[in-house]
């Protein structure tokens, strides 16, 4: 092996000599090592996810580390944006530079920097709404130096499948957004559906998610739901046409400020009578999302079927018992009966002013 290596080295040396003879004007190349200082400014977050609830406050961490060799710069710019679910664009939230500050859109008057030190760019969000859920980017620009970090704002809440009176698979994506909004909810994210599936959610009807995909969670594989011999998981139809394709939707809601209750009334009610009865009690007929929030987050339990705002009849069971969801805790669904039927009570909601 050594003689072979010596021969190779001799051959390479001879080749170099031949080049020198043939091209005397050719300069020998030299390897130049360039050293570069590391970034003089960096941005970091102590935690990548913050959990809060609707109506609460949250602080999204963003700390600046700045090289001492950098000259003081009063023009450092801090900008917070919210990333859309498909990451295709950013929504302005808050910008500050020197003494100039500005908040945008629905965040106006609800956001400010924590400012515990000159190097603290953490964002405080107050009176959190359902729409605040998502990922936020903190961007710091200091002269030619810049840095970014992304922090998620998660909400305590509950996910629920939904379809309207028209029946299953009647919602395009934009209809789905409106349907969830009408029920005091937003279209759920994949992360929220995944968490619900891990918690035991099993639902065999495909529904829209906020990224434009259509999926459904299966914990008990069976033939009509992706196949009996498949593993549990979230079945994924992928991205669908938001205008042309029609499915159900998975909605998400969180804590509310107010009181959800079953109205004690001397007789059963038609839908219109139910609406008026809640109004007479200083409330409004409750929405599906409010029932799910009361059931999941507050343990509300009532074995009386009652009208809700969308014309459906449901009742929430937290303690399974005979004749009241004997096998599991759930919001039981009695369908969309004729609104003239005088067969049900009503659930009302009274918000806190």
Label for each model-derived stretch:
Residues 2, 6-43, 159-160:
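N-terminal signal peptide
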Residues 27-30, 68-76, 139-157, 252:
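Extracellular/luminal immunoglobulin-like beta-sandwich modules
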Residues 58, 131-139, 247-248, 344:
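Conserved Ig-like domain signature around the intradomain disulfide
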Residues 62, 80, 136-138, 180, ...:
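Core motif of extracellular immunoglobulin-like domains
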Residues 68-108, 191-192, 289:
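N-terminal V-set
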Residues 108-151:
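Ligand-binding face of N-terminal immunoglobulin V-set domains in extracellular IgSF glycoproteins
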Residues 109, 156-174, 204-207, 222-269, ...:
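Extracellular disulfide-stabilized recognition modules
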Residues 173-200, 262-266, 271-302:
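Conserved hydrophobic ligand-interaction patch in extracellular adhesion modules
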């Amino acid at each position: 092996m050594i003689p072979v290596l010596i021969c190779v080295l001799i051959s390479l040396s001879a080749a170099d000599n031949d080049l020198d003879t043939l091209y005397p004007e050719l300069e020998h190349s030299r390897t130049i090592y360039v050293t570069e200082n590391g970034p003089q400014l960096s941005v970091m977050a102590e935690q990548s996810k913050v959990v809060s609830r609707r109506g609460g406050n949250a602080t999204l961490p963003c700390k600046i580390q700045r090289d001492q060799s950098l000259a003081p710069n009063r023009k450092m710019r801090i900008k917070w944006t919210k990333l859309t679910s498909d990451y295709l664009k950013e929504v302005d939230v808050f910008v500050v530079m020197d003494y100039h500050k500005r908040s945008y859109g629905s965040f106006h008057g609800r956001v400010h920097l924590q400012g515990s030190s000159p190097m603290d760019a953490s964002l405080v969000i107050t009176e959190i709404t359902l729409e605040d859920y998502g990922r936020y980017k903190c961007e710091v620009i200091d002269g030619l130096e810049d840095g970014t970090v992304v922090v998620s704002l998660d909400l305590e809440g509950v996910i629920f499948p939904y379809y309207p009176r028209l029946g299953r698979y009647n919602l395009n994506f934009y209809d789905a957004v409106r349907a969830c909004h009408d029920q005091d909810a937003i279209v759920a994210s994949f992360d929220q559906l995944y968490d619900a599936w891990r918690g035991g959610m099993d639902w065999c009807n495909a529904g829209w998610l906020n990224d434009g995909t259509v999926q459904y969670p299966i914990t008990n594989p069976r033939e009509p739901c992706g196949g009996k011999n498949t593993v549990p998981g979230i079945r994924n139809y992928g991205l669908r046409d938001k205008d042309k394709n029609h499915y159900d939707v998975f909605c998400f809601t969180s804590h509310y400020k107010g009181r959800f209750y079953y109205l004690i009334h001397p007789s059963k009610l038609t839908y219109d009578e139910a609406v008026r009865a809640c109004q007479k009690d200083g409330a409004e007929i409750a929405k599906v999302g409010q029932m799910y929030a009361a059931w999941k987050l507050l343990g509300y339990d009532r074995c009386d079927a009652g009208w809700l705002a969308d014309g459906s009849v449901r009742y929430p069971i937290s303690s399974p018992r005979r004749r009241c969801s004997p096998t599991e805790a759930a919001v039981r669904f009695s369908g969309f009966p004729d609104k003239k039927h005088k067969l049900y009570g009503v659930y009302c909601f009274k918000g806190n002013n």
